[in-house]
């Protein structure tokens, strides 16, 4: 397999604006110690990897209230509970609410690169080639515009 880098997703922590952590400009894993979270969950391998590596292995404690990929459930729980959501920054503008704020997770590993992956051993269709070229060109233009 080979991959073309598309963009970097930063980790983002969303919470109700009245949550005590909302007063901080950015958060660390230590800030999240002892917190109640709602997140995508074990269905996503990266969730389990990050929870194990950055929370449980160093001895930090978290309470997982719920695991769901449903943004409407996540937003409802953020609005009505003192929970936080650990996710990626792309979700911040997709599901805006005036009472939900987002803080960047400032750590050595603060996100991950997303790649367009292909198998060079498989012949691509013309449509697949056109889509790949379009997507890569679109990403370049988007990066230039900011």
Q: What is each model feature region?
A:
Residues 1-4, 9-10, 72-121:
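Beta-alpha-beta core module
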Residues 1-37:
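Flexible hinge/capping segments at coil-to-helix
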Residues 36-58, 124-126, 132, 142-145:
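Secondary-structure junction motif
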Residues 26, 70-71:
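Structural motif corresponding to alpha-helix initiation and N-cap regions
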Residues 13-14, 37, 64, 102, ...:
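Generic preference for hydrophobic
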């Amino acid at each position: 397999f080979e991959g073309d880098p598309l963009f970097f997703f930063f980790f983002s922590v969303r919470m109700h604006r009245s949550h005590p952590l909302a007063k901080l400009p950015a958060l660390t894993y230590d800030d999240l110690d002892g917190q109640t979270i709602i997140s995508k969950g074990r269905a996503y391998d990266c969730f389990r990897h990050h929870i194990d590596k950055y929370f449980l292995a160093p001895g930090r404690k978290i309470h997982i209230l719920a695991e769901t990929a449903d943004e409407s459930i996540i937003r409802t729980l953020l609005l009505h509970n003192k929970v936080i959501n650990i996710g990626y920054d792309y979700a911040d503008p997709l599901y805006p609410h005036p009472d939900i704020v987002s803080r960047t997770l400032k750590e050595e590993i603060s996100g991950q690169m997303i790649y367009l992956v292909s198998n060079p051993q498989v012949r691509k269709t013309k449509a697949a080639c056109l889509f790949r070229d379009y997507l890569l060109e679109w990403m370049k233009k988007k990066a230039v515009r900011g």
